[in-house]
């Protein structure tokens, strides 16, 4: 549907690291500890990337209101 299409568009617009973290956390429902091992990145950095990704996606989706 339209909301799903906009979500996918918003995710595609993210920087690569944020997109990867968001996809693994949101869609794959992985834990930060698992993502940390895969990407060889600290959990703190992953949480920051995820938070920024959610913020950018939210702003993008609200731009259609």
What do these predicted regions represent?
Residues 6, 37-40, 54-65:
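C-terminal edge and immediately downstream basic/flexible tail or linker adjoining helix-turn-helix-like DNA-binding
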Residues 21-25:
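A short pre-motif secondary-structure segment
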Residues 12, 26, 58:
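Short, locally clustered residues in the helix-turn-helix/winged-helix DNA-binding domain
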Residues 31, 40-45:
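Helix-turn-helix DNA-binding motif, specifically the short coil turn and the N-cap/start of the second
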Residues 49-52:
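Residues within the DNA-recognition helix of helix-turn-helix
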Residues 1-20, 30, 34-37:
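Amphipathic alpha-helical segment used for protein-protein interaction
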């Amino acid at each position: 549907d339209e909301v799903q299409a906009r979500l996918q568009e918003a995710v595609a617009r993210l920087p690569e690291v944020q997109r990867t973290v968001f996809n693994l956390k949101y869609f794959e429902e992985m834990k930060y500890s698992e993502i940390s091992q895969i990407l060889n990145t600290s959990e703190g950095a992953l949480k920051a990337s995820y938070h920024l990704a959610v913020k950018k996606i939210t702003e993008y989706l609200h731009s259609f209101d």
